[in-house]
Design a protein with these regions (language model features):
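Alpha-helical transmembrane bundles and membrane-interface segments of multipass inner-membrane proteins
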Residues: 1-137
Length: 137
């Protein structure tokens, strides 16, 4: 079984930049863990539960950026998990044409944007805390 099974012709959206092509992804990112649907669903459930618990019980003082990032990661993980449970694979359809990069979907984009938001929020907190320590000395 291939990790990525293209099942449609390319539909250009922005010529030379991005197009749509239906791909059945039986794995995770870049087709890793292909055919391990049960493992991927379990990992998705665990990560979604951890993020949800963190948002409810720990992140009460979280910034808007951190909250948005965690929500995007949670929603993306949930979306991909629903695909895996209902179809046995994730539906990927966005195909970058300007670089050699695997097809992805909106859930993947949400996860990526969410990780970036959380990292930026962490860096803002880190540098704000280090400035606070610097000024208090």
């Amino acid at each position: 079984m291939e990790a990525h099974t293209p099942s449609a012709a390319l539909v250009p959206v922005i010529d030379g930049v991005v197009g749509f092509r239906l791909v059945h992804n039986f794995g995770a990112a870049w087709g890793s863990f292909s055919g391990m649907v049960v493992v991927l669903v379990i990992v998705s459930i665990v990560f979604c539960a951890i993020i949800l618990a963190y948002m409810i019980y720990v992140a009460k003082e979280a910034s808007v950026l951190e909250t948005v990032g965690l929500a995007l990661i949670f929603a993306g993980g949930l979306g991909n998990m629903i695909d895996r449970l209902s179809r046995g694979y994730v539906v990927d359809f966005v195909e970058p044409l300007f670089i050699d990069f695997p097809n992805f979907n909106i859930a993947d984009a949400g996860i990526t944007c969410g990780i970036i938001c959380v990292l930026i929020a962490f860096l803002i907190k880190f540098f704000a805390a280090s400035k606070h320590v610097e000024h208090s000395e």
